[in-house]
Amino acid sequence: MTVTATPRPTGHPGYSQTLPREPESAATARRLVRTAMAAWGLEQDMIEPGTLIISELVSNAVVHSRLASIRVMVSQPTPSLVRLGVVDRSKVLPMLRTDSDGDQIHGRGLVLVDGFSHRWGTDLYRWGKQVWAELEVTS
């Protein structure tokens, strides 16, 4: 698998990788997040929430996407933010579930994303979407 880096206005590269739409891709996505954050010299305490967030975003894409692959993206759009995103070919919007059905084992990942990120959202495209979350850079 190939990791690509693109220049960003902050001087930091962005990292992205196309992965198979399967649960095992979450491990590769976590490694990509760790690699990017280490390359940017970010604090160790950002890695755990970043890897948790990307795992949840990948899991959602695995369940809800239509095609055989997804794209994971990690960038630092400003010196104070890291953006983690997963692009898929589904136009179904993610929903933050706040119900407390104790028997429900799926559907609470976005609650974790919401709790650990500075903010999160969805960018819609003609052919699909990107679900992203941002972490504030700690000094």
Named regions from a protein language model:
Residues 1-16, 62-139:
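Conserved beta-strand-loop-beta-strand hairpin that lines the nucleotide-binding pocket
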Residues 16-28:
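STAS-typified acidic loop motif
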Residues 19, 52, 57, 110-112:
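Generic leucine side-chain signal with a strong bias for well-ordered alpha-helical environments
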Residues 26-33, 110:
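Heptad-repeat coiled-coil signal-transmission/dimerization helices
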Residues 31-55:
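Conserved short strand/loop->alpha-helix "switch" segment adjacent to the catalytic nucleotide/phosphoryl-transfer site
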Residues 49-67:
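Histidine-centered phosphotransfer motif of kinases
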